[in-house]
Amino acid sequence: MSALRPPLIGSRSRNMNLKFRHKILLSACGVVVLAFALFTLYNDYLQRNTIRQNIEASVQQSGALTASSVQNWMSGRILVLENLAQDIGQQGAGDTLAGLIEQPSYTRNFLFTYLGQANGEFTQRPDAQMPAGYDPRQRPWYGAAANAGQTVLTAPYQGAVGGLMVTIATPVKSKRNGELIGVVGGDVTLDTLVEIINSVDFGGIGHAFLADANGQVIVSPNKDQVMKNLKDIYPGSNLRVAAGMQDVTLDGQDRIISFAPVAGLPSAQWYIGLSIDRDKAYAALSQFRTSAIIAMLIAVAAIAGLLGLLIPVLMSPLTTMGRAMRDIAEGEGDLTRRLAVQNKDEFGELATSFNRFVERIHASISEVSSATRLVHDLSEKVVSASNASIIGSEEQSMRTNSVAAAINELGAATQEIARNAADASQHASGASEQAHGGREVVEEAISAMTALSQRISESCAQIETLNASTDEIGKILDVIKGISQQTNLLALNAAIEAARAGEAGRGFAVVADEVRNLAHRTQESAEEIHRMITSLQVGSREAVHTMNTSQVSSEQTVQVANQAGERLASVTQRIGEIDGMNQSVATATEEQTAVVESLNLDITQINALNQQGVENLNETLRHCDQLAQQAGRLKQLVGSFRI
């Protein structure tokens, strides 16, 4: 808890540097600023709504009036043209047609008045030169009126002589049979509509314009916007030609747009658009904000001045009380002094509470003074007892260390015996395993020698059989030699007979000569085979003698190996007995080692506990010294108070 106090005090240092009168002054100014801010925001909200409602009402009224003016102007010309169509329908398109079209009521209201007949004839006043092959029936105004069967109004277009204009066209039907005579039309310039639109004034904060249902601007004070679409004029604004107020932005300027429909126009949907500068419309609101801020600053300055004069007067009792508390705190710690209570207000209650607090502190300090003396005496006694305990513990630690050293030596000797016994047992086990291995090797050698003796006997029999076979082969070779000799004689006789026969026996002589050569080679081969068989027979007899000698030696070796196997079995038995004794010794030694290690562990733990006890006593002694110092300090602090 004490570690958290410095940051807490530090975090409040900025507030503590301000005096209470300054805090009251700042709070009062803050309340005034907050009140004026809330009032300004609320009034701003009300005035904003009021201004928007007024703008909406004014826009609706102006839009309706302007739309009515446009409607009346266009309706008058439509009626004039429809009257012309009725007159032509009654009188027909004869010689009186030119006189009807040239009447002043038509020439004043239309730039051109004309009739396109069903037979392709075209009459226009004022008269003008038309292109060769001009057919009124192919013109859009003729087809639109004829198909609709009523008056139509074309889209605005740029005329050749009169600027921007529209065409009013209505069908002409005969009163006698109702057949279509043609279509009468009149070109109307929009200059009058421009004057009507430009006459709409909102006190310099906005203007009016005329647009169709597709958003194409027909009439506008800004000529750059004429015949352009609203989507191109206000890109990204999603402006719709519909009733209601819409907020858009043009060249970084916020504007309010509203539309009013122009009713009663045939085949056309026109709207009066009203564009108002938003900043100028809400200029009064900005002026009010500025006035409110100025009034707030004046009010804050006035309240700060008044409070600066009143607060010192109201705070005089608190100043007196603070001076008295400072005298008590900066004096000699005299707890017998009390504050004078002059009033029964909050400051009087504060002085009474302070006096009660000082009385409680006075009683507590008195009790602390007595307890401090008692704690100081007890701490000195505890220090003496701790010193005696430390001396006894150190003596006990020395004795315990001696016992631990002796047990460690005993444990080391026991471990050495256990290691030697384990090594002897391990060596005996190794010797036993080697003896077993030697016995197995001898037994395998005996088996191998026995098998070898048997194979030698079999080899002797096979060699004897081979010797007998070579004798038989020798006999066969003798027969072959005899046959070859006889063949040689027969070949010689055949050669002699062939010589006697002369030329007739020359071929037979050649054959006889070849037979003689073959018989000679056969005899030589038989002699060579006989020599080899003779040599083989000699080797076979020597091999038989050697095999017999080897068989006798192998039988003697088997007898010696059997005797060695019996001796190794006896050695293995004796080594096993020695191994068992070594294992018994090792087991007993290991048990003794475990007991010694247990004793050593107990002595070590006793020594550690003793050391811990000594450390605890030293720690207690240090704490007692600190307690004695704190008791002395507390005694000194208590002595600084006058009780």
Swiss-Prot record:
CDD domains: HAMP (cd06225), MCP_signal (cd11386), PDC1_MCP_like (cd12913), PDC2_MCP_like (cd12912). It is found in: Cell membrane. Residues 371-607 form the Methyl-accepting transducer domain. It is a multi-pass membrane protein. Disruption phenotype: Mutant shows different biofilm kinetics, reaching maximal biofilm formation earlier than wild type. Mutation does not affect the capacity to colonize the plant root. This is Methyl-accepting chemotaxis protein McpA. SUPFAM superfamilies: Methyl-accepting chemotaxis protein (MCP) signaling domain, Sensory domain-like. GO terms for cellular component: plasma membrane. Keywords: Cell membrane, Chemotaxis, Membrane, Methylation, Transducer, Transmembrane, Transmembrane helix. Residues 49-273 form the Cache domain. The chain crosses the membrane at residues 24-44, 293-313.
